[in-house]
Structure formats: structure tokens, C-alpha cells
Amino acid sequence: MLTFQHKEICMKKTMKNDSCLTVSRRAAIIRQDAEENYGTLLTLGESMRRAYQVEELIDRMRWDNVDFCLQRTDGTCLSITGTLTEYEHYFGRPYYENPSNRFLPYYDVHCRKWLTCRVAGIVFGSSVKKN
């Protein structure tokens, strides 16, 4: 059963013409991946919040360079500037996000190459601890 907070996240996503099922599916993947690779147990609310934030990050990356942080499996954070603006140029097709995919491709502006990161490793807001 969804709580008020989860319904609110789903309603925001639905207003952007994306289904609540997409966010829920990505939240389940994030929750499972965080436990397997980072040893972190996420609540349903936290995984839903992260899933929604990942969707927003992808939307911003389609149009511009975005600064974000990745948590490595050893706990350190890596600051990255990435984009998806040239995805279609390099790969010959537009980027279609798949909510069941554990990885997010991005073009690292500083390294000047295409890389992937684990969606569960993306760190948002106050939980960022730079080392």
C-alpha cells in the first residue's frame, strides 16, 4: 500500500506524462542494487525519492551538462559533469530510458568519453559526502 508521500511522488511523475509504474519499477531496481552493491538498506520512500530524482536528472541531461555525484562501492564520492545531449549523434538513435536498467550512460565532459554509472550510486542533496 502506498503512503501519502509515495502517492505524491507518483502524482508528480504522472503529471509529466510518465506513469507511476515507471517510477516504482526504477525504485525497486535502485533498492535492490543499493543493497547488493553498497550494503545499504533503503526504505520504500527513499528509493521512490531517488527514482524520481533520477528521472529528473535524465530529463536535465538530455538538454544540458549536469553536475552530479556518484558514490563508489568503497563509500567515496566522485563529482561528475555529464550529459546526454550528443547521444543520438554518437549512437545513431535517441536515448530511451528503461526503468529496469541498473546503469545510466552519460558523456563525461571532463574525460571526454562515454561512461556508465550505477543508478543506485547517484547521490543527491544532503546525503553528499565528498572525500
Which stretches of residues belong to each language-model region?
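Cationic, low-complexity basic patches in intrinsically disordered or flexible, solvent-exposed regions
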Residues: 6
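Short, conserved turn/kink motifs that form compact alpha/beta structural patches or helix kinks used as
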Residues: 70-103, 107-110
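Short, compact, well-ordered microdomains
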Residues: 98-131
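A short, Trp-centered hydrophobic/proline-enriched beta-strand micro-motif
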Residues: 62-72
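Charged, amphipathic alpha-helical segments
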Residues: 36-56, 80-93
